A protein has these predicted regions:
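Acidic interaction surfaces
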Residues: 1-125
Length: 125
């Protein structure tokens, strides 16, 4: 099933494009919050009315239109979705995705080097 994502922010970092976006969350807040600690009825009312946003966060690391890495975090509950950009939530996912993206760049660099070598050899014969 395809999910539609709403972009929260995008920016350049270390030669990559970082895209932070969100989509609706499949799981119920009841699976993440305890009735003894939270007023679940009020929470559901706040989500339904739009006072709270219940979503899954995604971070993608791109070069041009190529996705090198992505990380996801479900069960996000915020009054203002943009708070994920300043409270460390998105930064944690960005850091994880950047590590993966840098590994992927190195892997692809080596692969393209091998392909280039093969093509150079073919042209020399």
């Amino acid at each position: 099933m395809t999910k539609n994502y709403e972009e929260i922010d995008s920016f350049e970092r270390a030669g990559f494009t970082v895209i932070v976006d969100k989509t609706w969350e499949d799981i119920s807040p009841r699976d993440c919050f305890d009735d003894e600690c939270w007023d679940m009825k009020q929470m559901f009312e706040d989500i339904e009315s739009g006072r709270l946003d219940w979503f899954m966060l995604r971070v993608r690391i791109m070069v041009d239109e190529y996705e090198l890495a992505s990380e996801y975090l479900g069960g996000c509950l915020y009054e203002n979705v943009r708070d994920v950009l300043t409270d460390g939530t998105a930064e944690d996912l960005i850091a994880q995705a950047m590590v993966t993206a840098k590994r992927e760049v190195y892997r692809m660099y080596k692969k393209f080097q091998d392909i280039s070598w093969e093509h150079d050899c073919e042209g020399a014969v």
